[in-house]
Amino acid sequence: MENWTGRPWLYLLLLLSLPQLCLDQEVLSGHSLQTPTEEGQGPEGVWGPWVQWASCSQPCGVGVQRRSRTCQLPTVQLHPSLPLPPRPPRHPEALLPRGQGPRPQTSPETLPLYRTQSRGRGGPLRGPASHLGREETQEIRAARRSRLRDPIKPGMFGYGRVPFALPLHRNRRHPRSPPRSELSLISSRGEEAIPSPTPRAEPFSANGSPQTELPPTELSVHTPSPQAEPLSPETAQTEVAPRTRPAPLRHHPRAQASGTEPPSPTHSLGEGGFFRASPQPRRPSSQGWASPQVAGRRPDPFPSVPRGRGQQGQGPWGTGGTPHGPRLEPDPQHPGAWLPLLSNGPHASSLWSLFAPSSPIPRCSGESEQLRACSQAPCPPEQPDPRALQCAAFNSQEFMGQLYQWEPFTEVQGSQRCELNCRPRGFRFYVRHTEKVQDGTLCQPGAPDICVAGRCLSPGCDGILGSGRRPDGCGVCGGDDSTCRLVSGNLTDRGGPLGYQKILWIPAGALRLQIAQLRPSSNYLALRGPGGRSIINGNWAVDPPGSYRAGGTVFRYNRPPREEGKGESLSAEGPTTQPVDVYMIFQEENPGVFYQYVISSPPPILENPTPEPPVPQLQPEILRVEPPLAPAPRPARTPGTLQRQVRIPQMPAPPHPRTPLGSPAAYWKRVGHSACSASCGKGVWRPIFLCISRESGEELDERSCAAGARPPASPEPCHGTPCPPYWEAGEWTSCSRSCGPGTQHRQLQCRQEFGGGGSSVPPERCGHLPRPNITQSCQLRLCGHWEVGSPWSQCSVRCGRGQRSRQVRCVGNNGDEVSEQECASGPPQPPSREACDMGPCTTAWFHSDWSSKCSAECGTGIQRRSVVCLGSGAALGPGQGEAGAGTGQSCPTGSRPPDMRACSLGPCERTWRWYTGPWGECSSECGSGTQRRDIICVSKLGTEFNVTSPSNCSHLPRPPALQPCQGQACQDRWFSTPWSPCSRSCQGGTQTREVQCLSTNQTLSTRCPPQLRPSRKRPCNSQPCSQRPDDQCKDSSPHCPLVVQARLCVYPYYTATCCRSCAHVLERSPQDPS
């Protein structure tokens, strides 16, 4: 029945829309009245002022401060002294200065001002109805974005309701004041509404010229959106003059089942014959917002107050609920007319704006929030750092069924530095408890970087975290070296009188200073700070080289030695925070001073700067109100006075929904989805698409829609209720024993599946479930056993106590020998060695034969033999004859046979022999030379040797005492004369000689090595003069004269044998020139 009652009204609405279709063709053929806009973009806005910095995030130590700003639409100034212009266009381009025109677009197509009811998405800003067209794919939306023209409906762009609907005819004589949530138009004092005989809207292009004349319109009633703030009881109903009964919208039963049907408001006839629209909860629909419309007239959406980004979701009047645009009040002369006052109540100013539901959100380039580090008072020493406190917060929470004492784990890099990684005390693993630490936590100890929102931010030179600004070459924060200026020169004036003379002034902000004398001089550089305070070389005192702080920086004073050929110098990195003066203490003429520094210079001021384009000053448009009766003529006004007539701007009605040329008559619409694949936790479902008619919105056969344009029914995640908790057991550990019975362990935790996946929950949630075992017995294989591999061996001795052994091994189940550790758990190992007793031993002395040689060639000598004590089992070693070690027995010492005896080969006879000494050095260091040795005749009688006269050995052949020798190849070398006699016979004297360098042919040369030159002088006769041989120094051989004669006193043997004779030789030797 509902379909039959609504169909006539639909036909009537189509007939009334035909004139508008013709008008649309004219508008499209002429100049465009629409704002070229791209989806997802708004007009250019301006940043509001920064709010004050918030308080520090930490009570002590280092924290973070925040501040923000909002993006606002450009304000429009009101100049009462200028005449009111015609109504400006509703596009952001209309705010540009005259002559500039709109911005260039990448596409010649433009978006319509109104949105057709067949689309669910109407523009760059989305309100409660913004998701009506989400079922369309991105490809379809992009293809039809520039072709469809949709009407702008209340609540479409973020406001959610229309705060005011103005009736053009009122039957009440006593108008009531509108509620706070309704927008009121109030006229100024002493001025009345002047209706226009022919209401017209005059949209203007960028250059201000009118383009198209629009037909008169009336306002319609729209119920508020459920997303907006609730209406008060007195504002929950809105009165409108009844013209015709609105046609109810038709919806498909399947769409209703899927929850996409927007319920229509209920209408009742109230007092005075007015309709009352009661607000009902609304849902988005592909057919737009259902609102009662007056038959024969098209609704005129009311302009809204622009809102910034920070005002979204605060209702039509911001936070306070009070309109900041012009208020509407009834005109006393015309009860049905409403005039606006240019007063904003508590916020009265020269700004002018109207509440428009189609006002877009402005877009601004740049950052809307800034953060900086803040330093509070140092935290108490006993208080842990913030990261330790955050880890300690998990001490009372079980992890893997156990409580731990958590401490920070900071041995991480990169993005993990801002994660809360904690390590249980005494364990060798760490856990990431949260993905980000609290804002203001240091990324790592001792570093300036701070964690904010899980990111490690470094402070820039401006103090803002993450700004990335660095000082340029001249110290400008975030500069590009464009303002850097190098100041340098040479001071070559000869100088004035002696003393301090100012030579250079260094301004504040100077960097990389270099001041140096060109050459060494007796002059000194001096430095003075503000007020003439001496810093370097002041008060006629010369300071040592070093570092000195002045002007906010550190100056390095250098005074090199004069040998380097450099003068004094002063240098500093800067920047200087105060100006400093450089002086010279003149003591001679100026050798020249070089100086240079870098400073940031401000941009040059042009003599005739180009004026900046003025901010567009738009006057408030004249808003015309339709009178309740016949229009009255406009009263004349005095020339030169400002007309403050106010009227409501008339807007073209939205075109009737129709299918654009070239678009299919039907489209695929998402009406729901299949059941979730999981009854609990996370699952998937598939969307359901139906073929819908664009004209009627009814379901069509699938063949009416293009098969290629059907969106893919891709699976989408769905979330059900949480699943029941369950015990989750980990993997069993390895068996505690490699063989034999052992135990295994595993971890057990209570888990529960939610929509986002499974996670650990407290074990109490699984208390009603049987708890699985966490330990179990295990046996990998049987252990090995000990096996005796051989019998006992023979005893190590033949008699007495000894040792015997056998082979014992660990054998596995397969009979192979295995490690002894596998038998450790079984019976003890059998012994592999033990003691043995072979009975008492019998002992006796055994000896060998006497040696065949006598120890002496003549006279009495000694013969030897071996004597041992032997038992019946083994022989005793040396020294065991009496003790019998190892046998427990011993041989009788009294019966031990002797092991030595005397022998004689007859009496000895004296013999003589020649004895030769060692060869001496070669007489020539190079070339051919000779070697000498000593030869003496020695008599032997038994073991006694005596040196005798060489005549006693004359019967024997004498060995040679001289032989030739060959040295190295001859080179120039040093030659010396014999030493001269000692200058003193005792108590020290000197000897001298001549030294010359001779070549191989015995001529003087200078090519001898100087380091090998022999000494020309030496000491001699250093003994005391009273020294005499003592009585104990005697000659013990009668042949001492021969020893002296043969020069054998150099040998220790002869020195001891012939002590007195050799002592006299030593007394005379220093005087011997040879």
From Swiss-Prot:
Coiled-coil ranges per UniProt: none
A GO term, aspect molecular function: protease binding
Tissue and organ expression note: Expressed in colon, heart, leukocyte, liver, lung, skeletal muscle, spleen, testis and placenta. Weaker expression in bone marrow, brain tissue, kidney and pancreas. Expression studies in fetal tissues reveal strong expression in heart, kidney, liver, lung and skeletal muscle, but weaker expression in fetal brain and skin.
Annotated Gene Ontology cellular component terms: collagen-containing extracellular matrix; endoplasmic reticulum lumen; extracellular region; interstitial matrix
Xref: InterPro entries: ADAMTS_ADAMTS-like, ADAMTS_CR_3, ADAMTS_spacer1, PLAC, TSP1_rpt, TSP1_rpt_sf
Residue spans of biased composition, Polar residues class: 103-119, 206-226
Secretion signal span: 1-24
GO biological process terms on file: apoptotic process; epithelial cell development; extracellular matrix organization; pigment cell development; positive regulation of apoptotic process
Domain PLAC: 1029-1066
Post-translational modification: N-glycosylated. Can be O-fucosylated by POFUT2 on a serine or a threonine residue found within the consensus sequence C1-X(2)-(S/T)-C2-G of the TSP type-1 repeat domains where C1 and C2 are the first and second cysteine residue of the repeat, respectively. Fucosylated repeats can then be further glycosylated by the addition of a beta-1,3-glucose residue by the glucosyltransferase, B3GALTL. Fucosylation mediates the efficient secretion of ADAMTS family members. Can also be C-glycosylated with one or two mannose molecules on tryptophan residues within the consensus sequence W-X-X-W of the TPRs.
Residue ranges, annotated region (Disordered): 77-342
Localization annotation: Secreted, Extracellular space, Extracellular matrix
One of the Pfam families matching this protein, by short name: ADAMTS_spacer1
PROSITE patterns on file: PLAC (PS50900), TSP1 (PS50092)
Disease as annotated in the protein's UniProt record: Ectopia lentis 2, isolated, autosomal recessive: An ocular abnormality characterized by partial or complete displacement of the lens from its space resulting from defective zonule formation.
Quaternary context: Interacts with CTSB. Interacts with FBN1.
Record-given protein name: ADAMTS-like protein 4
Source organism of the structure: Homo sapiens
